[in-house]
Design a protein with these regions (language model features):
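Terminal signal-anchor or tail-anchor transmembrane helices
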Residues: 1-27
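Active-site rim elements
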Residues: 200-208, 266-272, 306-312
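C-terminal amphipathic/interface module of NAD(P)-dependent oxidoreductases
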Residues: 307-344
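C-terminal/domain-terminus segments
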Residues: 230-232, 236-238, 297-313
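A short C-terminal helix-loop "cap" of Rossmann-like NAD(P)-dependent dehydrogenase/epimerase domains
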Residues: 193-197, 254-267
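C-terminal helical subdomain
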Residues: 264-306, 317, 321-322, 329
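Rossmann-fold NAD(P)H-dependent dehydrogenase/reductase core
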Residues: 3, 22-251, 329-343
Length: 344
């Protein structure tokens, strides 16, 4: 009996050790960089929850002033309440931001300029995924929120960065799963009404396309800033696969999903990152010396990684041309010259 108990305890101990080792491997590295952010102004979209909130908290600890652009005021207020350090809380501010509303984005930028002058870092962190096909001003909502809204926001801020500015776009490594033929169909003139998405709407494919667009935005805008001699570097960051409710909230609609979610829980605990670890690569790109940051580059697990063919500038130019066409077709930015100039 004693022997059986010892064997059982040994097995349990071994499983726990393996679980911990695998979990630590899945979490990826912590950034080994720290940098004083005193007097730095950082704007982050979707900074009130998940990896955005952890990014916000770390930046505050380093001395930055952080403006969270969020759509949900209740969630933003909860985020502010979660910051216990009074000194840090005094440097954190919430402003309403709806990335599918050009007028709101414009007023958001103008208010920040009037209150803070120029900014140092823009983190395009916000992301959404809509289960059902939905249009907003003629544009599919996931694409509008995750990409087009951030494109508009970035363009409106371009002239209002302090020297050595940074734009950080959060994307996903799943961008690699998009075939060039799929991108060509998506960016064709026949898809200006998003008809490609209407039939057999695949919300995951649409989400991945919107994140590929973030990679393309970094490539295109980084190249534009270099050519125009604008002192800004633009990068993409894959935060990792995060064990939070982002996708589970979208699909929580059936007993099938509940069972699948329950069965996947051990795998997520082992292989997915928590929110703190998910923020590390974004923070790495905030704290890295500006000269070492690769303009247009893609970062994963606190390291630079070469883009695959689908993410390169040649394909980025196709997608940005598509963006221009849908913006003009739907009169999204009312002919705003600050935005339209990047398409020339």
């Amino acid at each position: 009996m004693f022997f059986e108990i010892c064997v059982a305890l040994f097995v349990i101990f071994t499983i726990l050790v393996l679980f911990t080792l695998i979990s630590n491997w899945g979490n990826g590295p912590l950034t080994d960089l720290t940098h004083s952010m005193k007097d730095k102004i950082v704007v982050i979209t979707g900074g009130s929850r998940g990896i955005g909130l952890e990014t916000t908290k770390d930046l505050l600890r380093q001395g930055a002033t952080v403006i969270m652009g969020c759509r949900d005021s209740n969630q933003a207020n909860k985020a502010l309440e979660s910051i216990s350090n009074l000194s840090q809380k005094s440097r954190c501010f919430y402003m309403h931001l709806d990335l599918t509303d050009y007028e709101n984005i414009k007023s958001f930028v103008e208010e920040i300029k009037s209150k803070y002058g120029k900014i140092d870092i823009l983190i395009n962190n916000a992301g959404s995924c809509f289960r059902n096909f939905t249009l907003s001003d003629g544009i599919e909502l996931t694409y509008f929120t995750n990409h087009l809204g951030h494109l508009i926001l970035s363009c409106l801020f371009l002239d209002d960065f302090n020297p050595k500015g940074r734009i950080i776009n959060l994307v996903t490594t799943k961008y690699k799963r998009v075939w060039e033929s799929t991108l060509d169909k998506f960016t064709s003139n026949s898809n200006l009404d998003f008809s490609y998405n209407r039939k057999g709407y695949d919300w995951m494919k649409t989400y991945i396309l919107s994140k590929l667009a973030g990679v393309h935005l970094s490539q295109y805008l980084g190249d534009y800033c270099t050519n125009q001699k604008i002192d800004i570097k633009v990068v993409s960051v894959h935060p990792g696969f995060i064990n939070n409710h982002f996708f589970r909230d979208i699909e929580k609609h059936s007993i099938y999903w509940f069972i699948r979610d329950f069965c996947q829980t051990p795998y997520r605990w082992c292989m997915f990152k928590d929110n703190v670890m998910g923020a590390q690569t974004t923070l790495h790109c905030c704290y890295m010396e500006w000269e070492q940051l690769s303009n247009g580059g893609y970062y994963r697990d606190c390291h630079y990684e070469q883009l695959t063919h689908i993410g390169l500038l040649k394909n980025a130019q196709k997608l940005i041309a598509f963006d221009k066409a849908i913006i003009e077709k739907n009169n999204i930015v009312k002919g705003d010259k600050k935005i339209m100039q990047i398409f020339k």
